[in-house]
Each structure stands twice: as C-alpha cells, then as structure tokens.
A protein has these predicted regions:
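Secondary-structure boundary elements
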Residues: 8-75, 83-85, 113
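Hydrophobic/aromatic-rich core segments of domains that either
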Residues: 79-140
Length: 140
C-alpha cells in the first residue's frame, strides 16, 4: 500500500503548498469523514474544463498537475481525480488514481482507503456512482 501514499508522476503535491494546506483544513476525525470532505470540496469547488477536454481529445500522454488544478479551480476528470488523490495522500490516506471508462467514455476517478475498505469517489460526476457503470483499465 505504500505506493498509494507517495507522490507520483500523476499524483504529486508540494508538502508545504496550498493544496496540502487546504487538505489539512478538511481533515476530520476519521479517514472516511476526511475522504468525504475532500470529495465534497473537489467536486463542488472545481469546474469541469470542457475547452481543455476538447483540446486533449484523442491525444495521449497528458500528465495532470494537481497544484495547477488547485490554483486554476478547473480541470478535466483526470485533473480533478489527481487533485483529490494528492490531497488524500498528503494526509496519509491511501488513494488510487483510477483510469477507465464510464458508459464507454474515457474517465478518471479515485479509490480511497477508509481503513476498512476502498471507496470509489468520482469528483467529476459529483456522486458516488453506480459501480456497474465503471470499467477500470489501470490504477496510478
């Protein structure tokens, strides 16, 4: 599980940066409550960037920058999932950045460990979605 706690190419943050400081403000008594707070924050405070999605459509190799997403307050699904993942990991909560499809469309979401089980969180779609719609390709 250590790899789901560490910064990575797709889920990085500055330990003294604004993203980590904001995550600390959202921390609650339990991992589950903290996951819920971070999820709510990312899903409600960050807009979906349709223009960016159109520009990146059909391209490969995009690497999200959670710190940039935090500053701009917008991003595509990969950005929002990467941001949520980075915020949770900065608090010591294991989190996976998951890439796959939902209803046949490329998508990214988060799977976070609450101490008992992995919780699927989709900060782009704004809900705890029906798991049957998600097809996981890989975790980062």
């Amino acid at each position: 599980m250590p790899s789901f706690l560490e910064p990575s190419k797709y889920c990085s943050w500055l330990s003294e940066g604004k993203l980590a400081m904001q995550a600390k403000k959202l921390e609650k008594g339990s991992s589950r409550d903290t996951i819920t707070e971070v999820y709510r924050f990312v899903s409600t405070k960050f807009n979906y960037d349709g223009e960016k999605a159109a520009q990146l459509s059909g391209t490969r190799g995009y690497v999200p920058d959670p710190e940039e997403t935090y500053e701009s307050r917008k991003g595509i699904c990969f950005d929002k999932a990467s941001l949520m993942c980075a915020m949770l990991r900065s608090l010591g909560i294991p989190a996976k950045l998951v890439v796959g499809t939902i209803d046949g469309v490329s998508h990214a979401w988060v799977s976070a460990f609450d101490g008992d089980k992995w919780m699927k969180c989709d900060p782009t779609m704004g809900g705890w979605q029906d798991e049957s719609e998600y097809v996981e390709r890989y975790e980062l």
